[in-house]
Amino acid sequence: MSSMRKKGMNKTTIKNYAIWARNELIERVTRKAFEYEVKKDIKSDDNMDVINGKVLTEDERKQRKGLIKAVDDKGFDQVIEEVAYTWFNRFIALRFMEVNNYLPKRVRIFTNENNEFKPQILDEAMNIGLEGLSKEDIYNLLQSNNRQELYKQLLIATCNDMGNYLPGMFTRIGYKELLFPDNLLNNDSVVARLISDIEEDSFNVQKEGQIE
């Protein structure tokens, strides 16, 4: 297969994935907003301490207030679109850095060394040392076998850590953390599809563009 034809196939695959991922992220981000009683065309009470029986942490209360203010300023749809776009861009950036061994911690975020969707970061969670995520928190999540929540916290902490290296791309998350999509370890998640749908070589700066 010629490199030109392969590139054309890659572009089509990437485009199809991007369209699907955008819609999927918008749906999941919207669902998270609803969980925190932030909905379109409905005035939200920004002083709630308990939602659906769940007591909000101090960080959650601050983030929720920030989210409500953003919705008041920009509109619900615009905020949801921006958050979905933010997470999409960060997943793509992290995957690019993972494939090219650019990650500062030298630990793969989405895959193992065989490019299987078995995130190395889960195995190295106790050793990676990410600001904002204590070993006690990690240990408790490991003990409760809550891998989905552990992975979520590791990804959020990684994005915040990357702000020390690429502050323009990885700004502090703020209220976007509330709207982080759930269940990213599922085989049909945006992250899983990123690995399965788009060839690793598409992100490899050394291999991409080589003539076959």
Regions found by a protein language model. Give the residues of each.
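Preference for the N-terminal adenyl/adenosyl cofactor-binding alpha/beta module
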Residues: 2-212
